[in-house]
Swiss-Prot record:
It comes from Human immunodeficiency virus type 1 group M subtype H (isolate VI991). One of its GO terms (cellular component) is host cell nucleolus. Escorts unspliced or incompletely spliced viral pre-mRNAs (late transcripts) out of the nucleus of infected cells. These pre-mRNAs carry a recognition sequence called Rev responsive element (RRE) located in the env gene, that is not present in fully spliced viral mRNAs (early transcripts). This function is essential since most viral proteins are translated from unspliced or partially spliced pre-mRNAs which cannot exit the nucleus by the pathway used by fully processed cellular mRNAs. Rev itself is translated from a fully spliced mRNA that readily exits the nucleus. Asymmetrically arginine dimethylated at one site by host PRMT6. Methylation impairs the RNA-binding activity and export of viral RNA from the nucleus to the cytoplasm. The keyword Nucleotide-binding does not apply. This is Protein Rev. Homomultimer; when bound to the RRE. Multimeric assembly is essential for activity and may involve XPO1. Binds to human KPNB1, XPO1, TNPO1, RANBP5 and IPO7. Interacts with the viral Integrase. Interacts with human KHDRBS1. Interacts with human NAP1; this interaction decreases Rev multimerization and stimulates its activity. Interacts with human DEAD-box helicases DDX3 and DDX24; these interactions may serve for viral RNA export to the cytoplasm and packaging, respectively. The gene is rev.
Amino acid sequence: MAGRSGDNDEGLLRACRIIRLLYQSNPYPEPAGTRQAQRNRRRRWRARQRQIHSIGERVLATCLGGPAEPVPLQLPPLERLTLDCSEDCGTSGEKGVGSPQTSGESPAVLGTGAKE
């Protein structure tokens, strides 16, 4: 693989083999039995698939040396966030009603949190 060292290639190939083996160990359930039994088998299969997916992510992160902690999402300060419904107010079925907007000033929209 271009631009990578041979050692890293071996780790990546080993990780791919492990992940492939994990997915092959959980075949789709057979369509036999009652509808309820089929539904239960599919539900359990999906739960196992989710577990395999998370294990596969961990295997890749371990073999490729990814970051241990995810990079946190940078959010604006809460003081600058306001809920302004003046532009879009309408019936509750419309989309976009009350979308959050940021402004330069920090009005006391929610108050201090103390009950009156």
